[in-house]
Amino acid sequence: SLHDALPIYGNFGGTAAVLEMLLQSYRGELHFLPALPAAWPQGRCRGLRARAGYAVDLHWEEGALSRAEIVPATDRNCTVLQGAGKFTVADETGAEIACREEGHRLCFEVKAGRTYTVTPKV
């Protein structure tokens, strides 16, 4: 072949780096906007995929999370890192669901295919 395949790896790496700035999902925990650039004070991303089979949409304003929507692929316990702020979680009907706090982690049960909305506590 006359074309070097290596430049495409750089493109994939750049895309992965941007994704890691917006969403991390290590150790079974979801971490929203862990390294949001100051140059992006508001925005949204839809259709992100996290480990453990989550689909995630993120919305942010003034450099902070305003809403995250999580759709799990399987029934499971979901863990969200809260960082400095605290979150609430609502189901598809808008009803707040029971969560337990474990340090900076917020844990709650999710059902496959249902949408859960995470918002900052006011």
Give the residues covered by each predicted segment:
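Generic recognition of long tandem-repeat/solenoid scaffolds
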Residues: R67-I70, R105-E109
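Surface-exposed coil/turn segments at beta-strand junctions on protein surfaces, enriched
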Residues: R49, A73, E101, E109-K111
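Solvent-exposed beta-strand/loop surfaces of large extracellular or lumenal domains
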Residues: K86-F108
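Tight coil/turn sites that cap or link beta-strands
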Residues: K111-T115, K121
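Short, small-residue-biased leader/transition segments that mark boundaries at the very start
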Residues: S1-L6
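Catalytic cores of secreted or luminal carbohydrate-active enzymes
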Residues: I8-D57, E61
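Short, well-ordered beta-strand segments enriched in hydrophobic/aromatic residues
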Residues: V56-L58, L65-P72
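Surface-exposed beta-strand/loop patches in extracellular or lumenal glycoproteins
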Residues: E69-G85
